[in-house]
Amino acid sequence: MSKVYDWFEERLEIQAIADDITSKYVPPHVNIFHCLGGITLTCFLVQVATGFAMTFYYRPTVTEAFASVQYIMTEANFGWLIRSVHRWSASMMVLMMILHVFRVYLTGGFKKPRELTWVTGVVLAVLTASFGVTGYSLPWDQIGYWAVKIVTGVPEAIPIVGSPLVELLRGSASVGQSTLTRFYSLHTFVLPLLTAVFMLMHFSMIRKQGISGPL
């Protein structure tokens, strides 16, 4: 094993990378509230794992979506647990994100030179809310259906571009299969990909600039 490690070490300098990660200075004023961002990340990873597991059983069609969710909850092995953890961690992720935003704002973590870190954080907050909107509709029950109808109907009030925007969100003039397909694609592919990219940017900036000092 040592020869294998030495082979990788010679080419990738693994030890230098590990030393850089583990030797980063942590300011003495840091407390438990500075962990809120990390908890949000943990919830996101739980969401990815449990969401991926449910894709094996979920069927994104208006005729089978609700039945597939019922199957997950009643017949699939540990399906009830996986979906419950997914729901709980979703709520926890939103709560931790909100508390994290408040902590950063109240401690002035958005000030120079960390403006871009704040901007990426706001984008992540919007993406988190988008997860909630798109995921809420996937069971395609009465609550999900009417929630989608209301949310996608909001842009209708925008002059000129309102109607085309509504049709873009729904995939047609009314809520139906095209809408569910769009929301499923957003929830399982587009939003996770964007979130991963912006999280990488967010953490890279924090890594480069360090944690902001006390007020």
UniProtKB/Swiss-Prot annotation:
Cofactor: heme b; heme c
Stored InterPro entries: Cyt_b/b6_N, Cyt_B6_PetB, Cytb/b6-like_sf, Cytochrome_b_N_euk/bac, Di-haem_cyt_TM
Keywords in alphabetical order: Chloroplast, Electron transport, Heme, Iron, Membrane, Metal-binding, Photosynthesis, Plastid, Thylakoid, Transmembrane, Transmembrane helix, Transport
Cellular localization per UniProt: Plastid, Chloroplast thylakoid membrane
Domain of life: Eukaryota
Topological category with respect to the lipid bilayer: Multi-pass membrane protein
GO molecular function: electron transporter, transferring electrons within cytochrome b6/f complex of photosystem II activity; metal ion binding; oxidoreductase activity
GO cellular component assignments: chloroplast thylakoid membrane
UniProt keyword Transport, yes or no: yes
Free-text comment on the cofactor: Binds 2 heme b groups non-covalently with two histidine residues as axial ligands.
PROSITE patterns in the cross-refs: CYTB_NTER
Listed transmembrane segments: 32-52, 90-110, 116-136, 186-206
Any Gene Ontology biological process: photosynthesis
Keyword Chloroplast: yes
Database matches in CDD domains: Cytochrome_b_N
Sequence positions that bind heme c: C35
One Pfam short name: Cytochrome_B
Main location: plastid
Binding site for heme b 2: H86, H187
Positions annotated to bind heme b 1: H100, H202
The protein's role, per its UniProt record: Component of the cytochrome b6-f complex, which mediates electron transfer between photosystem II (PSII) and photosystem I (PSI), cyclic electron flow around PSI, and state transitions.
Subunit (UniProt): The 4 large subunits of the cytochrome b6-f complex are cytochrome b6, subunit IV (17 kDa polypeptide, PetD), cytochrome f and the Rieske protein, while the 4 small subunits are PetG, PetL, PetM and PetN. The complex functions as a dimer.
Similarity comment: family membership: Belongs to the cytochrome b family. PetB subfamily.
Name this polypeptide is given: Cytochrome b6
Lineage start: Eukaryota, Viridiplantae, Streptophyta, Embryophyta, Tracheophyta
Name of the gene this protein is made from: petB
